[in-house]
């Protein structure tokens, strides 16, 4: 099955756990999720405990959870605080218990920096409550990416001189330094664009995505069913550009399709798609048709990536759960709009040609304009990319983050194929 990430599962009825892993390898913040398929147990509280047997004495955590509540029925651990190697995870739920073997593999300069910082700040190994930006020392300038340093233009000169940034990307990267975004025209292969558009049309017509015709709804998790969306998340040209920008390998965490403009208010992505160290996430948006005036075009506020970043601890509100966003809208979104109003920056309406790639900084203020002509579509898709070696979490909801494995085998069966095979077996 193709999913957000491959899940290495340990199962002991009536409970099972899912671990964020790829073929048994774990990195960053590792989430261990307790689930049950027994309807009678889904809303029944149980003591859930996790222990890492090879870790220092006392490396365990316990919490009381309700398996049917996905937002709270998990325990996570910072794998950066462990040496790379194989570990045994012992878990228990009520009278049930089992073990899972995983391999911790945090590699690269960024991972080493994060590990050192977590040890220095005595960040706990286990998390049993919400993930929050207050856990990490985001004010350490040494941890920021090169493009967020005061001498970023001089650093770009060095990267160009040493060949770590090709000359053809210089103007794009300088615009990123000054304005927080850049565009590369004719980026996406025309054949892939046709496949992406066909997939969205099919999803909208069949209702598979829950899309309501004419609405501004997003098409989520399309890569699970449609190969074209899987391909765009691992598109080599996009990966190369973002890896070069970050100066470290990156991985996409999601892909979203759009048939129409979102009409979304100005916002920063970092509160939803969060990373430590800050700065190591960016959006990659691709136009799947020529964007027309009045279609609900993207709106960008150039230079807003240098504005204050609003996180949940700054807003002083509870994490969002069960899709209850009203408090978030009344606090965080109000603060975003205040930043826009106080800046005096004129919004830029973005009307790209088909196949153009737009890359933006995690702090860039952007949104969707009003759809003045509802007959016009604005077909596009977006992926968000994290640098490998960082800690991925979602500050708005307090959940550990996940990624789409860039090197995963593409011969994995789709859900549709699995359903067909099951039907054939049952029909025999």
Spans of features found by a protein language model:
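Short, compositionally biased P/S/T/A/G/V-rich stretches that sit at domain boundaries
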Residues: 1-39
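Surface-exposed, short loops/turns at beta-strand junctions within beta-sandwich domains
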Residues: 79-85
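Edge beta-strands of extracellular beta-sandwich domains
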Residues: 97-106
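Non-heme Fe(II)/2-oxoglutarate
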Residues: 117-161, 310, 314-318, 354-359, ...
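Non-heme Fe(II)-dependent double-stranded beta-helix
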Residues: 126-178, 184-268, 272-277, 396
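Short, conserved beta-strand element in jelly-roll/cupin
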Residues: 276-293, 351-354, 359, 384-388
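Double-stranded beta-helix
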Residues: 294-365
């Amino acid at each position: 099955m193709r999913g957000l990430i491959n899940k290495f599962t340990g199962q002991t009825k009536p409970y099972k756990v899912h671990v964020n892993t790829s073929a048994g390898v774990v990195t960053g913040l590792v989430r261990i999720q307790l689930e049950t398929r027994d309807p009678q147990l889904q809303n029944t509280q149980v003591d859930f405990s996790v222990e890492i047997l090879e870790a220092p004495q006392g490396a365990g955590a316990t919490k009381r959870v309700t398996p049917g509540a996905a937002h709270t029925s998990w325990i996570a651990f910072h794998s950066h605080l462990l040496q790379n190697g194989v570990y045994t995870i012992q878990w228990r739920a009520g009278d049930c218990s089992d073990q899972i073997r995983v391999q911790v593999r945090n590699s690269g300069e960024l991972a080493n920096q994060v590990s050192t910082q977590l040890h220095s700040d005595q960040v706990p190994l286990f998390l049993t409550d919400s993930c929050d930006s207050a856990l990490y020392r985001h004010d350490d300038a040494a941890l920021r990416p090169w493009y967020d340093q005061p001498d970023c233009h001089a650093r770009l000169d060095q990267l160009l001189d040493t060949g770590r940034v090709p000359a053809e990307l210089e103007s794009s990267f300088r615009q990123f330094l000054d304005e927080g975004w850049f565009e590369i025209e004719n980026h996406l292969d025309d054949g892939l664009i046709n496949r992406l558009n066909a997939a969205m049309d099919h999803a909208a017509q069949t209702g598979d995505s829950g899309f309501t015709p004419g609405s501004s709804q997003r098409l989520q998790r399309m890569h699970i069913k449609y190969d074209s969306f899987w391909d765009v998340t691992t598109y080599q040209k996009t990966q190369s550009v973002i890896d070069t920008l970050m100066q470290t390998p990156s991985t996409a965490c999601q892909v979203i399709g759009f048939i129409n403009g979102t009409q979304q208010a100005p916002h920063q992505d970092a509160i939803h798609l969060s990373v430590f160290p800050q700065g190591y996430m960016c959006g990659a948006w691709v136009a799947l048709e020529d964007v027309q005036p009045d279609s609900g075009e993207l709106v960008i506020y150039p230079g807003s990536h240098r504005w204050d970043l609003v996180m949940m601890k700054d807003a002083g509100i509870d994490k969002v759960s069960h899709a209850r966003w009203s408090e978030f809208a009344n606090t965080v979104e109000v603060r975003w709009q205040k930043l826009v109003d106080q800046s005096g920056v004129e919004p830029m309406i973005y009307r790209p040609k088909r196949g153009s790639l737009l890359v933006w900084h995690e702090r860039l203020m952007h949104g969707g304009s009003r759809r003045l002509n509802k007959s016009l579509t604005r077909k596009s898709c977006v992926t968000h990319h994290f640098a490998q070696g960082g800690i991925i979490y979602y500050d708005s909801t307090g959940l550990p983050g996940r990624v789409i494995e860039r090197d995963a085998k593409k011969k994995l069966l789709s859900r549709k194929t699995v359903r067909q095979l099951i039907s054939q077996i049952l029909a025999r």
